[in-house]
């Protein structure tokens, strides 16, 4: 009995805890690369296991490009929200241990390559489902504005939860935002790199080529071009248009035709959207229950008989992909029938400072008040609206509409304010199954924290409001104070009753103004660090006002841009 208790106690001991106290890291290593180590960790708030990614900064003293790669991965993961893209939870810089830490979701079955090698007898129906999910993730990346190219798509970078058949794209360290018509850097894994990558002039279709190689890997259990012994041999074959030998071992004509469409010349190559509409990925005949044997790979003689089963109809993308031209996936759906009222009100606090309140109410009487500062010297309506959507996980409003409302209110308060929403990105409609955008319990909010661990008691930007006396809940996410409640009602005698206080005694406008100053201070601190010296072996002491946190995206921006280009 004592042995069992000792085992439980040992397994529950955290070797490290994040600054917020929410995530605890175990000593168990899930994976290890040249610079990054992934540990098993636990989310105490949600009661789920997560992946704790740790990158030692001392590994980059001679290779700052690799450091920027990891900052890029963290920055991109934070801004992405899709069911087929790896979820990002939080990140922080540990200045004492000189490490970057970020927490992502944990995949129970590892990578798709590992999973496929463990389960060799897989029906074509399952392969199709995996393909559809990967393409949906790619479509989301490519439909961003500007598009995002993964640049290193392979089964090693695709993860799966085997108990649900859920597939997600991860490892975005080499991903690039396509700000021009093409990218100009040769990166990736040679076996999965399209011919145009070697010419260093390419677009998002290189991911489609890599996806085709992934399909080939799924059905052949091996890397493409495994017959080559050196990257130079792969380069010669790829640039001369020769397909890998494994392609010719695929006997199923439909599989071969589908892969060939992915590997076609860039001028003829289909997009992720077009591949999703390809007949190969559509459901089989439900009436006939066609179950003919399939022998899709001739190079492995233990696969046995594969049966083609009818697929279940997946209506998720029927409405979303009616148009063949998509600039960016819309973040929210807001139909007229939702009866959602939105209003915004603000007041000036100084020359450049403005304090705003965005109020969202619905037909069921729920009210959401979002308080936030706006500094006209550095903020734009679009950037603040996007930040609000990302931080607060708003799912039922249009980011463009919010940006326009912010612009209009700022213009009313500042006569010489220049409206910026006309040049902002247009957003298309992406139906979202999340219904409310109102939290059920404050304790379970999926907020993102970015803090600096300094060895002392950590402070973070998540403040709980006192909601014990009313039916409301509130929290602070970065610059935003988020308050939920119910609309005022009237009793039988006509007396007005309110389900919540107008403002909590623990939160005031002064605190929001201090929060704005902290945000500005931490930005300047990062610029001073990057101007003064590069990251080195000696820990850097950072003295901040309690409640301050260093934002990884800000640090990433400071690294990526010339210091002189940033206005102090």
Swiss-Prot record:
Mention one GO molecular function.
protein kinase activity
Q: Where does ATP bind?
A: 104-107, 154
What are the entry keywords? ATP-binding, Kinase, Nucleotide-binding, Serine/threonine-protein kinase, Transferase
Q: Give the CDD domains listed for this entry.
A: STKc_WNK
Enumerate the Gene Ontology biological process terms. Answer: photoperiodism, flowering; protein phosphorylation
The record places domain Protein kinase at 24-281
Residues at the active site: 171
Q: Which reaction does it catalyse?
A: L-seryl-[protein] + ATP = O-phospho-L-seryl-[protein] + ADP + H(+); L-threonyl-[protein] + ATP = O-phospho-L-threonyl-[protein] + ADP + H(+)
Compositionally skewed regions (Basic and acidic residues) per UniProt: 463-472
| Class of this enzyme | transferase
Superkingdom classification of source: Eukaryota
> Which intervals of the chain are annotated as region Disordered?
453-473
Q: What does this protein do?
A: Regulates flowering time by modulating the photoperiod pathway. Possesses kinase activity in vitro.
Name of the protein in question: Serine/threonine-protein kinase WNK2
């Amino acid at each position: 009995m004592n042995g069992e208790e000792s085992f439980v106690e040992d397994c529950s001991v955290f070797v490290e805890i994040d600054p917020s106290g929410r995530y605890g890291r175990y000593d168990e290593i899930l994976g290890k690369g040249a610079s990054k180590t992934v540990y098993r960790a636990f989310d105490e708030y949600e009661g789920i296991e997560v992946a704790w990614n740790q990158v030692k900064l001392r590994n980059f003293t001679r290779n700052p490009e690799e450091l920027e790669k990891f900052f890029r991965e963290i920055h991109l993961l934070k801004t992405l929200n899709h069911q087929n893209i790896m979820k990002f939870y939080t990140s922080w810089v540990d200045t004492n241990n000189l490490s970057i830490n970020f927490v992502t979701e944990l995949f129970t079955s590892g990578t798709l390559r590992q999973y496929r090698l463990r389960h060799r007898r897989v029906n074509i129906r399952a392969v199709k489902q995996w393909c559809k999910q990967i393409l949906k993730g790619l479509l989301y990346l490519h439909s961003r504005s500007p598009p995002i190219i993964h640049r290193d798509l392979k089964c090693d970078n695709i993860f799966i939860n085997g108990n649900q058949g859920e597939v997600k794209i991860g490892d975005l360290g080499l991903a690039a935002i396509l700000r021009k018509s093409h990218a100009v850097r040769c990166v990736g894994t040679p076996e999965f790199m399209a011919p145009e990558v070697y010419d260093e002039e390419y677009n998002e279709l290189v991911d489609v080529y890599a996806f085709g190689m992934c399909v080939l890997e799924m059905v052949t259990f091996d890397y493409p071009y495994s017959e080559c012994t050196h990257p130079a041999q792969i380069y010669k074959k790829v640039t001369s248009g020769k397909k890998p030998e494994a392609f010719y071992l695929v006997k199923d004509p439909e599989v071969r035709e589908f892969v060939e469409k992915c590997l076609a010349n860039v001028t003829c190559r289909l997009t992720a959207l077009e591949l999703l509409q390809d007949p190969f990925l559509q459901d089989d005949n439900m009436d006939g229950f066609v179950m003919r044997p399939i022998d899709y790979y001739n190079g492995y003689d233990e696969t046995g008989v594969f049966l083609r089963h009818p697929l279940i109809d997946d209506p998720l993308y029927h409405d979303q992909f009616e148009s063949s031209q998509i600039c960016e996936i819309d973040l929210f759906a807001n139909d007229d029938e939702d009866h959602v009222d939105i209003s915004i009100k603000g007041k000036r606090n100084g020359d450049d400072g403005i304090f705003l309140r965005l109020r969202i109410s619905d037909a069921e009487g729920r009210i959401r008040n979002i308080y936030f500062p706006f500094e006209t010297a550095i903020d734009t309506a679009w950037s603040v609206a996007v930040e609000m959507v990302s931080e607060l996980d708003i799912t039922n409003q249009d980011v463009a509409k919010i940006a326009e409302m912010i612009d209009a209110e700022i213009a009313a308060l500042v006569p010489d304010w220049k409206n910026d929403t006309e040049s902002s990105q247009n957003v298309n409609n992406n139906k979202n199954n999340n219904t409310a955008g109102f939290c059920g319990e404050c304790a379970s909010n999926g907020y993102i924290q970015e803090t600096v661990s300094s060895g002392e008691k950590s402070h973070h930007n998540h403040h709980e409001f006192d909601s014990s006396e009313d039916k409301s809940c509130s929290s602070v996410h970065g610059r935003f104070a988020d308050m939920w409640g119910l609309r005022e009602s009237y009793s039988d005698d006509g007396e007005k009753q309110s389900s919540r206080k107008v403002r909590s005694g623990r939160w005031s406008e002064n605190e929001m103004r201090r929060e704005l100053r902290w945000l500005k201070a931490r930005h300047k601190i990062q610029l001073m660090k990057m101007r003064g010296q590069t990251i080195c072996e000696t820990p850097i002491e950072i003295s901040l006002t309690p409640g301050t946190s260093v934002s990884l995206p800000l640090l990433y921006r400071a690294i990526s841009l010339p210091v002189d280009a940033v206005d102090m």
